[in-house]
């Protein structure tokens, strides 16, 4: 529930409790604003598995995975972390290219072989050979 933002933590916990009463296996109280609020959520919801969403630059404090587990969160979303890291890497690589006029092959780049592995190129080449006419 995103009720925390509009109606406060108490209302969000009441809604999550209602979802649990209706059979929810897990609940998600969006955007707790402090560690204190984060600690209250799993306790107030009597051990029902909880999801927490961590956004770099967001409202919820960023804590270590083990701390979140100790609090009672069983699923953690690291929203946008891969995208933000990729954008940062792109900015560095393209900034170097703009500044120097050449690619820095030893810079913040995955190797060509790593790129091919990540996109499963061999797998798709085999599919192409199998199904192409």
How would you describe each model-predicted region?
Residues 1-96, 130-133:
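Alpha/beta enzyme core
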């Amino acid at each position: 529930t995103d009720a925390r933002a509009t109606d406060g933590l108490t209302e969000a916990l009441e809604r999550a409790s209602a979802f649990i009463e209706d059979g929810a296996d897990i609940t998600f109280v969006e955007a707790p604003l402090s560690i204190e609020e984060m600690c209250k959520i799993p306790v107030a919801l009597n051990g029902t598995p909880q999801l927490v969403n961590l956004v770099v630059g967001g409202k919820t404090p960023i804590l270590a995975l083990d701390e979140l587990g100790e609090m009672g969160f069983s699923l953690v979303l690291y929203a946008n972390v891969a995208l933000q890291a990729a954008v940062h890497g792109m900015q560095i690589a393209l900034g170097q290219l703009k500044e120097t006029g050449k690619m820095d092959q030893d810079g913040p780049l995955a190797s060509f072989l790593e790129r091919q592995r990540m996109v499963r190129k061999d797998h798709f080449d085999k599919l192409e050979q199998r199904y192409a006419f």
